[in-house]
């Protein structure tokens, strides 16, 4: 795993050095960590916007400090307080929500507050990470940790009016597991998410 994370960081650094915008499409949310590390090296005033069903703020998960359940906590370790903006959150341990109260800007259940966050960030460099389990499992069951009560596709499309105003310097879409949705509907939705993001951030 360490080799894979190092490779992701190196490739992200190369893309950024060419003054291009990294856009990763991946399965495990942990791969966001090295990409944010590389982006932070170039943009020390970086902010992170996270769309996700889960806080991902555990100190450790199954005795591992590097995991999809700890990725945002590891990012906070070097990014610091007030730099992480979480939306759609509807699952997490009590300790994670307490940590968020003190160290991140957490918005439960939906994307309410996004417009205000975008207005506050203005031209600040932003890394956008979208965990696809932010969507309701009724429309996106193909993910490892689905959570009821998520957003729907048109809510996401509407959010892009705000997202398009941001200075997004890198981004990713993650946590699609096609094997968990043999209908192909989740894969189709993931493809539409990627397409709409490309159109929004041009």
Task: Please state what every model-predicted region is.
Residues 1-202:
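Conserved alpha-helical scaffold segments that buttress catalytic/binding sites
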């Amino acid at each position: 795993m360490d080799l894979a994370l190092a490779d992701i960081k190196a490739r992200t650094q190369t893309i950024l050095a060419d003054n291009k915008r990294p856009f990763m499409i991946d399965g495990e949310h942990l791969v966001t960590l090295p990409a944010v590390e590389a982006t932070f090296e170039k943009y020390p005033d970086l902010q992170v916007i996270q769309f996700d069903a889960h806080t991902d703020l555990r100190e450790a998960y199954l005795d591992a400090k590097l995991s999809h359940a700890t990725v945002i906590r590891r990012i906070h370790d070097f990014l610091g307080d007030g730099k992480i903006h979480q939306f759609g959150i509807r699952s997490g341990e009590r300790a994670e929500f307490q940590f968020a109260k003190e160290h991140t800007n957490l918005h439960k259940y939906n994307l309410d507050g996004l417009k205000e966050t975008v207005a506050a960030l203005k031209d600040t460099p932003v890394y956008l990470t979208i965990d696809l389990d932010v969507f309701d499992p009724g429309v996106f069951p193909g993910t490892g940790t689905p959570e009821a009560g998520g957003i729907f596709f048109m809510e996401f499309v509407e959010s892009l009016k705000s997202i398009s105003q941001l200075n997004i310097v890198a981004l990713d879409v993650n946590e699609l597991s096609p094997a968990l949705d043999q209908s192909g509907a989740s894969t189709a939705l993931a493809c539409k998410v990627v397409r709409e993001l490309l159109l929004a951030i041009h």
